[in-house]
């Protein structure tokens, strides 16, 4: 049986913006906004963090804490999965903790993609020169990602 969980990595010690997960957005911490939208999907949703301040917002039932210095959110998700914490799930959706504009519709698009592919990524056609914005270099013939980067892509 297929069982899917949403994992939201949320690192306190970000090199670009320390404490970003708890930044207040209209009276609610950003990470809580992301979490609340993800739970609208009906899927079990968990926050993965390195810091007690974030852990205390959710508690042990909805949050996994590991102070290992992972390089990125994907590594944090892999660490939690490898640890066995999520043994009852066999599919995972990694939603970035700094994506307060995520919608349940995006989650459903990912679920639909996972019915066909082992890995799926949602991206928007939105050229950006912002080094904080991750860009996807994709193969237009196969509609697959070749790489992800924060640097400017040549065709922009």
What are these regions, as identified by a protein language model?
Residues 1-18:
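N-terminal nucleotide-binding beta1-loop-alpha1 segment
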Residues 102-156:
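Conserved core of the sugar-phosphate nucleotidyltransferase
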Residues 52-95, 99-109:
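Short phosphate-binding loop-to-helix
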Residues 8, 48-50:
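Conserved sequence signature across two-component system core domains
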Residues 20-25, 63-64:
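Short glycine-enriched, charge-decorated loop/helix-capping segments at active-site entrances
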Residues 9, 94-96, 122-125:
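Short beta-strand segments
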Residues 29-47, 56-59:
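A short, N-terminal amphipathic alpha-helix
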Residues 3, 43-46, 118:
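Residues at the starts of beta-strands that form the adenosine-phosphate
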